[in-house]
């Protein structure tokens, strides 16, 4: 602190927590803005007309929102809000698998419009191209494997 002239490590920890809370709060705020603006109703109407399997639909919407906003938090919360009315009649197992598909879609191809991309780049001291090849490709693999695993679970559990 100031009196003993020691570095204030505690302040750095508080700052990290504040940034995390602000990011989550901003993600929730953007989600609500998208819902209030009618984006969710438009996507729901298109989704209902697409006649797609629930898991693929959930994954694709989450991917689209992740790419548009750069935030996995926004992609997750907004996709869940959009699909909630359509998924109301699903069994608990099916709802859980839809949530997993949303989570998998929300991490698809992290790129320059995502704060996490820049954090990884700085933390590991990577160049932009390296970050795309390492982090973005890894995130895409995680997302696709997550979707495949969720589809397999749907096949065997429902």
Model-derived features with residue positions:
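Single conserved hydrophobic/aromatic residue that forms the stacking wall/gate
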Residues: 1-11, 15
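Structural signal for alpha-helical transmembrane segments and their membrane-water exit/capping regions
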Residues: 3, 26-35
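Helical membrane-embedded segments and adjacent short helical loop/helix-boundary regions
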Residues: 12-24, 35, 52-54
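Hydrophobic alpha-helical transmembrane segments of multi-pass integral membrane proteins
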Residues: 25-27, 50-90, 102-103
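Membrane-interface interhelical connector segments
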Residues: 34-52
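Hydrophobic alpha-helical transmembrane segments
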Residues: 55-60, 99, 132, 136, ...
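Alpha-helical membrane segments and immediately flanking helix-loop junctions
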Residues: 65-69, 75-83, 95-128
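Juxtamembrane and boundary regions of transmembrane helices in multi-pass small-molecule transporters
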Residues: 105-158
């Amino acid at each position: 602190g100031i009196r003993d002239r020691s570095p204030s490590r505690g302040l750095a920890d508080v700052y990290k927590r504040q940034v995390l809370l602000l990011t989550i709060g901003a993600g929730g705020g953007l989600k609500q803005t998208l819902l209030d603006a009618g984006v969710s109703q438009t996507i729901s109407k298109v989704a209902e007309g697409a006649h797609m399997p629930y898991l693929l639909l959930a994954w694709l919407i989450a991917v689209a929102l992740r790419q548009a906003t750069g935030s996995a938090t926004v992609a997750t919360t907004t996709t869940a809000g959009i699909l909630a009315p359509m998924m109301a009649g699903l069994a608990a197992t099916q709802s859980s698998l839809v949530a997993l598909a949303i989570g998998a879609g929300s991490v698809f191809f992290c790129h320059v419009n995502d704060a996490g991309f820049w954090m990884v780049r700085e933390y590991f001291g990577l160049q932009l191209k390296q970050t795309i090849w390492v982090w973005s490709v890894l995130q895409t693999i995680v997302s696709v494997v997550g979707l495949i695993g969720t589809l397999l679970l749907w096949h065997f559990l429902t």
